């Protein structure tokens, strides 16, 4: 059964004849309904530390709000160029992201003698350099 059929069925049951003989109308005003939960106890007065709860400006907890950061200038703490201030403050070396888009390239194969280029390759580059 879908949700629409349940609503339609409820609309059929709420006819004026049934509403006139329904039990909730016969209950006194102070009596609690059996199908509903008992009324909750009144809440204690809120602590002024918690604020009114209508914003993120002030929220309590073990962590106090951060102080205003000083303006960046020549007298401020040394900052690594291109790095995040938190990383510079931690003193950690720049770490590469775990999932980098760049595929790591294998090192250039070296000749056992230590030269990376053969004599033939060197001769070809010399021919292309001098027209």
UniProtKB/Swiss-Prot annotation:
Residues 31-131 are annotated as: Disordered. Residues 31-40 have a biased composition (Low complexity). This is Putative uncharacterized protein encoded by LINC01465. It comes from Homo sapiens. The gene is LINC01465.
């Amino acid at each position: 059964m879908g949700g629409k059929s349940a609503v339609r069925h409820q609309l059929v049951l709420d006819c004026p004849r049934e509403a006139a003989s329904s039990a909730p109308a016969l209950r006194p005003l102070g009596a609690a309904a059996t199908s509903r939960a008992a009324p909750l106890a009144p809440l204690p007065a809120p602590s002024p530390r918690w604020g009114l709860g209508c914003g993120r400006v002030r929220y309590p907890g073990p962590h106090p709000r951060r102080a205003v950061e000083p303006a960046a200038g020549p007298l401020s703490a040394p900052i690594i160029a291109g790095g995040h201030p938190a990383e510079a403050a931690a003193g950690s070396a720049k770490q590469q992201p775990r999932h980098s888009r760049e595929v790591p390239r294998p090192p250039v194969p070296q000749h056992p003698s230590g030269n990376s280029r053969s004599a033939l390759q060197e001769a070809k580059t010399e021919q292309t350099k001098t027209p």
